[in-house]
Amino acid sequence: LPILMIYFQGFGITHGQCLKIYKRFGPNAKEIVQKDPYILCREIKGIGFATADRIGSMIGINRESDSRIKSGIDFVINRFCAAGNTYMPKNKVIEETKELLLVKEELIEGNIYNAFLEKKLIVQKINDIECVFIPIFYYSELGITERIARLSIQNYQTINTDIEFEISLFEKKSGINFADSQKEAIIGAFTDGIEIITGGPGTG
């Protein structure tokens, strides 16, 4: 383990990260990482693509290797989804990955296709635009859609009450004044059976 620590710390890997690497890969960690340094950003929490790519460059990994390109694609898509998106237009994936890795577009496209065949990425057209999904986001959206479809055809018991009066009464008691759009949402929740409420940051 001490020899392993010295080796990885030479790449700027912290003591804690070294322990994680050893715990995951055991005594053969050095050989495993030398063969594919990009395994670090895929399997070790806290080690990102930039670190793995720096190690790859230092040990002479081919910049056009499939492992590097696949990891770069994953990084680009995850970064885009971290901003609140659930998929990324394929042409944007290719453009940003090319900018990140400085490799040919056809290599990126080929790796997207291979990831699709391996079911590691999902490619689907939305409004005639090819889009790339991480499977967990794709199936989450699909599940939500199916659930909403089921709920929308169910029969709901009608609530016989003056909702606007109840809202007004609540406002007086609580000192809270709802905006018109908020009142519409409350009324809709009582009258429509199902309601989808969306809003960006800071909308309450």
Predicted regions and their residues:
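Conserved ATP-binding/catalytic motifs of P-loop helicase motor domains
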Residues: 1-204
